[in-house]
């Protein structure tokens, strides 16, 4: 069954990046800094982790001391899968959690859906106005197309924020950034020392929540609970309801949560020339080619991996030794869809979702 799961921040949060200070006992990445930068949005891997936490909570399998009998460990494996998500393992099982859609936002009061604003949208406050391109031009790299003279202004840059489906209003100020400054104790060559730090935190507008569509076993998740995500384990209120109970998804059917959200977006924005829009982050293969014209943001990710049998907190979690390079949601490609790296497990949790807009 497909459910709508929303996560409302109860306090400012920090969603970690490679630019962060380390914590005692953790593997170093070479990117540690006195500044802990934060992303505005949670990763798909983090949302999967939150849903697994909720499934364990519903099943009565959360122990604060992480101590489980062999029988309980078998129940945990059946409930949420045998191991942490890994990009390098395309065949994985997540127990009662079958599939996720890409992240989006909802306005809980208006009951509307918001998606990352396509980067080629020229409307700054309201509307969807795809950028118009000129005739093809031959060059050393092949055939390219450029925006018409008035279609792109370098001083303004390309589109950002979130686009509300239905009204097509653009929201660019849903997040507020806060900085925490202070000193913390760190271990340097077996000695404790004081170290200066600054940590970024974000607050999401109170009328909005992070959201995913999740296909799970029936009644596998609690309908209303608190989960913890990010650095310092910020609290989020998680609420679950059948997807069909939310107005945008009423009467809609699809083979997967990603297909359900994708169909909604394509029906709303299918106008003009052929553009391909990254509704989710994309996994780009080596030698990835961008085509005749595109507007793309890149990002890197090291997800957190957990060892089920480890009882000590510092040894239970580690950063992935592999840094993955992704194309950020909101990126757009003209003319033809990009070739992506196939990864069944990543696609099942909401990666590699591209919408065909127009054409």
Spans of features found by a protein language model:
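Conserved active-site/ligand-binding neighborhood in enzyme cores
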Residues: 1-359
């Amino acid at each position: 069954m497909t459910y709508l799961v929303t996560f409302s921040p109860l306090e400012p949060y920090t969603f970690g990046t490679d630019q962060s200070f380390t914590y005692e006992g953790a593997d170093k990445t070479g990117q540690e800094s006195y500044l802990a930068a934060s992303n505005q949005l949670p990763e798909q891997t983090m949302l999967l982790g939150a849903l697994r936490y909720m499934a364990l909570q519903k099943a009565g399998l959360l122990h604060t001391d992480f101590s489980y009998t062999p029988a309980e460990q078998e129940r945990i494996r059946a409930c949420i899968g045998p191991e942490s998500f890994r990009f390098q393992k395309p065949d994985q099982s997540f127990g009662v959690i079958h599939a996720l859609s890409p992240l989006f936002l909802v306005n809980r009061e208006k009951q509307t859906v918001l998606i990352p604003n396509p980067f080629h949208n020229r409307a700054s406050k309201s509307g969807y106005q795809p950028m118009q391109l000129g005739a093809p031009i031959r060059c050393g790299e092949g055939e390219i197309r450029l925006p018409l003279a008035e279609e792109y202004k370098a001083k303004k840059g390309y589109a950002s924020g979130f686009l509300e489906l239905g009204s097509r209003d653009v929201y660019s100020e849903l997040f507020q950034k806060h900085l925490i400054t202070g000193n913390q104790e760190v271990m340097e060559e077996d000695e404790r020392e004081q170290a200066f730090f600054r940590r970024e935190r974000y607050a999401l507008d109170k009328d909005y929540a992070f959201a995913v569509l999740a296909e799970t076993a029936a009644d596998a998740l609690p309908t209303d609970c608190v989960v913890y995500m990010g650095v310092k384990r910020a609290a989020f209120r998680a609420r679950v309801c059948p997807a069909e109970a939310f107005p945008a998804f009423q009467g809609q059917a699809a083979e997967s949560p990603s297909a359900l959200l994708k169909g909604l977006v394509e029906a709303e924005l299918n106008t003009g020339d052929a553009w391909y829009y990254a509704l989710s982050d994309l996994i780009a293969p080596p030698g990835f080619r961008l085509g005749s014209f595109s507007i793309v943001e890149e990002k890197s990710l090291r997800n957190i991996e957990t060892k089920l049998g480890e009882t000590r907190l510092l040894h239970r979690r580690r950063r992935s030794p592999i840094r993955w390079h992704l194309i950020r949601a909101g990126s757009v490609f003209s003319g033809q869809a990009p070739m992506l790296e196939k990864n069944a497990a990543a696609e099942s949790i909401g990666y590699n979702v591209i919408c065909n807009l127009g054409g």
